[in-house]
Curated annotation (Swiss-Prot):
Additional detail: Present with 238 molecules/cell in log phase SD medium.
Subcellular location: Nucleus
PANTHER family in the cross-refs: SEX-DETERMINING REGION Y PROTEIN, SOX TRANSCRIPTION FACTOR
Keywords: DNA-binding, Nucleus, Repressor, Transcription, Transcription regulation
Domain of life: Eukaryota
Protein source organism: Saccharomyces cerevisiae (strain ATCC 204508 / S288c) (Baker's yeast)
Residue ranges the UniProt entry marks as DNA-binding: 10-83
Region (Disordered): 100-121, 242-273
Transmembrane helix listed as a keyword: no
Induction: By heme.
Protein name: Repressor ROX1
GO biological process terms, semicolon-separated: cell differentiation; cellular response to increased oxygen levels; cellular response to osmotic stress; cellular response to salt stress; negative regulation of transcription by RNA polymerase II; positive regulation of transcription by RNA polymerase II
GO annotation, cellular component aspect: chromatin; nucleus
Low complexity bias (residue ranges): 102-121
Length: 368
């Protein structure tokens, strides 16, 4: 029975294959039951009968076609108003989609009715709860985990800060050496931002009083660097001149001031031109900031990187006062090459006083 119409559904008239299938289906089941064979599924039985139908002779098929014609005439006599109206699959799908859409619309209407039926006074209260939850999630917590996460985020933000490279004429450290191209120039204004490479250093603002200005200069010169560690021996401290006798002490990373107030020994990273400018300070017009105390470590870091690229063997020559020919590219003389395992070593182990050139082989350790 069709629920939309009260009239029963009229079956279609049987064709030749359906009549043939009904006939042989009964025969096969009777044979299998007599033999005690398990009866297969109807789909398999239809395949067996289909192969037999294709293998029939045209004369045998004509018999079943005649039976189908008689079946059709009998069907017309019983149902004279019958007309075959096939329903396409697309229409079936469309009907299913329409039914699904109708069900969804009904559910939405029911939900809207339920929301409207609720009292409207509860809405501001619920909104306040949501705002309180958000504020609680954004408030700083006193737990250790939240403080650690905040510190970690702060450290990452500090690491992402750019290191400025200002190339000005005011107290700029000249670091260009022949045969040793260095990476960048720094000014005294840039040093407080180099926390990843340098230790804490004093930085003073420019006072207007000349007496306090000299006081700051003397304090900055005499103050040693905190937490200083032994670094790679500076090459200029190993060999001064070929005529001089070797000294058995090494240079450390600290910078000391001389007794004279007008002259003081700056770090090896500063040039001779800078030392000349130190001697010609005018109290009324110019002010010189404190010397760059950690510049030795910077220079040794760049020196280590350059020596690492050149290889484990390098040549040291006597240096002039201008520090221009730091490394030599000449062919080394064939002498015994001692090995330097540590940083602080006696100089008589590596210096050959009879020659002007000294070849040394060292295991470099990166300065911290």
């Amino acid at each position: 029975m069709n629920p939309k119409s009260s009239t029963p559904k009229i079956p279609r008239p049987k064709n030749a294959f359906i009549l043939f299938r009904q006939h042989y289906h009964r025969i096969l089941i009777d044979e299998w039951t007599a033999q005690g064979v398990e009866i297969p599924h109807n789909s398999n039985i239809s395949k067996i009968i289909g192969t037999k139908w294709k293998g029939l002779q045209p004369e045998d098929k004509a018999h079943w076609e005649n039976l189908a014609e008689k079946e059709k005439l009998e069907h017309e006599r019983k149902y004279p108003e019958y007309k075959y109206k096939p329903v396409r699959k697309s229409k079936k799908k469309q009907l299913l989609l329409k039914e699904i859409e109708q069900q969804q619309q009904q559910q939405q209407k029911e939900q809207q009715q339920q929301k409207q039926s609720q009292p409207q006074l509860q809405q501001p209260f619920n909104n306040n709860i949501v705002l309180m939850k958000r504020a609680h999630s954004l408030s700083p917590s006193s737990s250790v985990s939240s403080s650690n996460s905040y510190q970690f985020q702060l450290n990452n933000d500090l690491k992402r800060l750019p290191i400025p490279s200002v190339n000005t004429s005011n107290y700029m450290v000249s670091r260009s050496l022949s045969g040793l191209p260095l990476t960048h120039d720094k000014t005294a204004r840039d040093l407080p931002q180099l926390s990843s490479q340098l230790n804490s250093i004093p930085y003073y603002s420019a006072p207007h009083d000349p007496s306090t200005r000299h006081h700051y200069l003397n304090v900055a010169q005499a103050q040693p660097r905190a937490n200083s560690t032994p670094q790679l021996p500076f090459i200029s401290s190993i060999i001064n001149n070929s005529s001089q006798t070797p000294v058995t002490t090494t240079t450390t990373s600290t910078t000391t001031a001389t007794s004279s107030p007008g002259k003081f020994s700056s770090s090896p990273n500063s040039s001779v031109l800078e030392n000349n400018r130190l001697n010609s300070i005018n109290n009324s017009n110019q002010y010189l900031p404190p010397p760059l105390l950690p510049s030795l470590q910077d220079f040794q870091l760049d020196q280590y990187q350059q020596l690492k690229q050149m290889g484990p063997t390098y040549i040291v020559k006597p240096l002039s006062h201008t520090r221009n020919n730091l490394l030599s590219t000449t062919t080394p003389t064939h002498h015994h090459i001692p090995h330097i395992p540590n940083q602080n070593i006696p100089l008589h182990q590596i210096i050959n006083s009879s020659n002007t050139e000294v070849t040394a082989k060292t295991s470099l350790v990166s300065p911290k």
